[in-house]
Structures are given as structure tokens and as C-alpha cells.
Amino acid sequence: MKLLFVDCCISQRGEESRTHKLAEAYLKAYLDRHPEADLETVSPEELLELAPFDVEMLEERESLAQSGAFDDHVFDMARQFAEADAVVVAAPYWDMSYPAALKVYIEHISAVGLTYHYEMDGVHGDCQAQHLVYLTSGGDFEHEDSIGVLHWRQLCRLFGIERFEYVFAGGLDIDPAMTPDLMEGACALAHKLAETI
């Protein structure tokens, strides 16, 4: 069983990244429950190396897709995502959304004919993952219309991933005295979630 971890924990805190701590809590519990899982990680460095698609790149990718050349390197991220049995995405809550590097990654995995396709009744997902978990943290409290959460929920529908779950560690910069307790609570939620999947 292949577990894909998309690590977009870009942070000035380095190893003290709060989003990464949330991810560690989830992954530890998940791997304890599923010791057979093969963990594959897309690192922050790999994400930052991805280029956003310009017109030339889009035309090249479309030409490759039409010829069925999905083994080309431009589809590497999409193939990896499509073949994962479970996906964890971790990214901080930046500017009411998430880091730009994650949006570029989404461009790379959104490949018609590989991660989804069209039929007369609309779009159908082609990814084999049964669930995707989105982990995020932010200085502000969670809002009902948090873009990161909404976007990944919609992407799961696009990719045919039936179950979407998330943990939002929020309010971390409101009162520094409360931050440790808030993080502890969020990590406990992530741990508990992993035990149910």
C-alpha cells in the first residue's frame, strides 16, 4: 500500500514548523496502524523546483497526453499521485490559502487522461486513492470558507477520491501563551483521525 505525503511545510521555523508537527503526529499514528504502508514523500524542495505551466508547456503536455505518452517526465507528479492508495497533504495557512508552490503542484497533478477524464455526463476521477487528508495550521482561527480546505475537498471530487478529511490547527498567533495547548489539541486530533483510517 502506497502512502503519498505531499510536504509543503515551507516555514521560517524550519524543523519547528507547526504544520510539519501536525503531519508528524498524523503520519506516526497512520504508519503504526498500517506498518505495511510504503511512504513516498514530495519534499518542499521538490515542490519549489516545479515550474508553473506557460503556454508552451501546456501545448507540449497536451500533445503528449493526446499521444498517450504518460510516461514522459512532465507527468511524473501526476502518475505518482494517481497511483497512491492514500494521500496526505500538509501546508501552512498562508494569505487565506496556502503557499504558491502547492498551487503549482496541483497544476502538475491535474492531468487529463491520467488523474481524471471527461465523459458526456461530466468529469470522472481516475486516481486510486481511497482518501486524502489535508493538514494545515495558521495564526488565525479557522473560517468556514477556508480556501485550502475547500479547494482540496473539490479536488478530491475531481480526482475521484471518495473520502476527504482535514485538521486545521488555528489561532496559533492570537495568544502565544495558548499556542502549545492549541498545537497539542490539533496533534491529538490528527493522531485520532489516523486511527480511524
Residue map of PLM features:
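N-terminal beta1-alpha1-beta2 submodule of the flavodoxin-like/Rossmannoid cofactor-binding fold
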Residues: 1-91, 96-100, 104-107, 189-197
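Cofactor-binding loop segments of dinucleotide-utilizing enzymes, especially the Rossmann-like FAD-
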Residues: 8, 44, 136-137, 169
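Short, glycine-/small-residue-rich phosphate/pyrophosphate-handling segment
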Residues: 118-161
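Flexible, glycine-rich phosphate/dinucleotide-binding loops
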Residues: 12-13, 48, 141, 173-175
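Hydrophobic/aromatic-lined pockets within catalytic cores
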Residues: 27, 31, 110, 114, ...
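A conditional alpha-helix N-cap/helix-loop micro-motif detector
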Residues: 67-70, 114, 183
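Conserved nucleotide-sugar donor-interacting segment of glycosyltransferase catalytic cores
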Residues: 106-121
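Glycine-rich phosphate/pyrophosphate-binding loop and the adjoining helix
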Residues: 143-197
